[in-house]
Regions:
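Short loop/turn segments immediately following beta-strands, especially the blade-tip
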Residues: 155, 201-206, 265-275, 377-380
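Beta-propeller fold detector
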Residues: 96-105, 160-165, 207-222, 272-286, ...
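Beta-rich, blade/repeat-based domains predominating
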Residues: 57-68, 110-128, 132, 168-187, ...
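Blade-loop segments of beta-propeller domains
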Residues: 93-130, 134-138, 142, 161-169
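Beta-propeller domains
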Residues: 73-104, 140, 153-155
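Conserved beta-strand positions in repeat-built beta-propeller and related beta-rich domains
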Residues: 74-80, 131-135, 140-142, 188-192, ...
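Beta-strand-rich domains and repeat architectures in extracellular enzymes and scaffolds
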Residues: 51-85
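Asp-box/WD-like beta-propeller blade repeats and closely related beta-sheet repeat scaffolds
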Residues: 137-138, 142-184
Length: 384
């Protein structure tokens, strides 16, 4: 048997090494404040912060986009069971009109020159608007047109051009839903077959990434106050990745299937020629354990605003990963995609999606009118 001789002070050296290692880990690992914290249960704002802004007795609006000049855009997708127009503008005098005009909202005609199935809108800092047209006006039927992006000058109210989504990036069951744009790149989520499409706008080329990735696939049911959101036939509504936003600097995108958790991806990986397929699968980070969402938007400072359909709440999440429950109110019946103006207001459609025709065997049970609420955001830091 071999006997190992112990060197003098070996115990001291080991202790010193452990102390040094512990100190190194303390520096390398994030402090507890760096991790995301739980969403507060008590809302910060009182009921008086939420006031009716406008209403519709014919359409279920699922998204709102405030324009810098005080006008407001509303999306009313065909798949929900809405009559036209699918995109409309509320002028400063309170009147409504199809947007950008009646021809682009026509129910028939050349699919390349009209909105077939509105599926997402996003306003850029330069004042131009991008509209996603999925080409799928009925989620239970095949596509009737090739999906496209429509670029609109909101000052002149004219279409600047369109970008067709390449068919090679699509699956037969693809239903595009959700768009975010930074400079010359558009990011589009696929809610029919989970994935994200990256569109180079100048070349009109499209590439597909994260195909059927678990984080983007509907693995959890959409929860509403009464239980699970179901289609009219009783099946749980399974909708893959349909919500997306890009950070103001274009470095990150966040994506989510309505019932899943929020994921974050660094956009540079999409243009990295050396990344392997295996590494690509690992680039997705779970960013927050969100509840079921009806929509989200991002502010110029990177703050995310979420519509929580499980509790009829509006939540926010800062770049420092600080969550806030801004308001909870039963009037926010299935809140949709909110719109942020430049004056500290968030506009939220209470879209009652669970009562729309698509979820009620073709016959809507919506309590009219559908209301868009104005929420005055807090100007103070979150409570500690």
């Amino acid at each position: 048997m071999m006997i190992r001789r112990t060197r003098p002070f070996s115990g001291f050296r080991r202790a010193l090494a452990l102390t040094t290692l512990t100190a190194s880990l303390a520096v390398a690992l994030p402090t507890p404040s760096a991790w995301a914290v739980h969403m507060p249960k008590v809302p910060e704002l009182s009921v008086s912060a939420l006031t009716p802004f406008t209403q519709s007795d014919k359409q279920v609006w699922d998204a709102v986009v405030p324009l810098p000049d005080g006008r407001m855009l509303f999306e009313a997708p065909a798949w929900i069971g809405n009559p036209g127009p699918q995109l409309s503008v509320r002028n400063t005098d309170g009147s409504f009109a199809p947007y950008p005009d009646a021809d682009w909202n026509a129910a028939e005609g050349d699919a390349a020159k009209r909105i077939v199935a509105a599926a997402g809108v996003t306003l850029l800092p330069d004042g131009t608007l991008w509209v996603l047209d999925s080409g799928v006006p009925n989620r239970k039927a095949p596509a009737v047109a090739q999906p496209k992006l429509i670029h609109i000058d909101t000052q002149k109210n004219t279409v600047l051009g369109t970008v067709a989504i390449e068919k090679t990036a699509l699956h037969p069951d693809s239903i595009l839903s959700g768009v975010a744009v930074h400079e010359n790149t558009a990011y589009v989520t696929d809610s029919g077959v989970a994935g994200v499409l990256v569109v180079d706008i100048p070349s009109a080329s499209t590439r597909r990434f994260l195909d059927r990735h678990p984080s983007l696939t509907a693995t959890r049911p959409i929860q509403i106050p009464g239980g699970t959101l179901n289609w009219g036939d009783g099946r749980a509504a399974a909708i893959d990745s349909s919500m997306i936003a890009v950070s103001p600097d274009g470095r990150w995108i966040v994506m989510q299937a309505p019932g899943n958790y929020l994921s974050r991806v660094e956009t540079s990986t999409f243009s990295d020629p050396d990344i392997t397929p295996a590494a690509m699968e690992e680039i997705v980070t779970q960013w927050y354990k969100t509840p079921s969402l009806g929509g989200m938007t991002i502010g110029p400072d990177g703050t995310l605003y979420w519509s929580d359909v499980s509790t009829n709440s509006i939540l926010s999440y800062s770049t420092g990963r600080i969550p806030r429950r801004l308001i909870t109110n039963p009037r926010l019946n299935f809140p949709g995609t909110p719109g942020l103006d430049a004056h500290g207001h968030l506009f939220v459609p209470a879209m009652q999606l669970n009562h729309a025709a698509a979820f009620q065997n073709g016959k809507a049970t919506v309590t009219w009118p559908v209301t868009v609420y104005q929420l005055t955001l807090p100007t103070t830091p979150p409570p500690t």
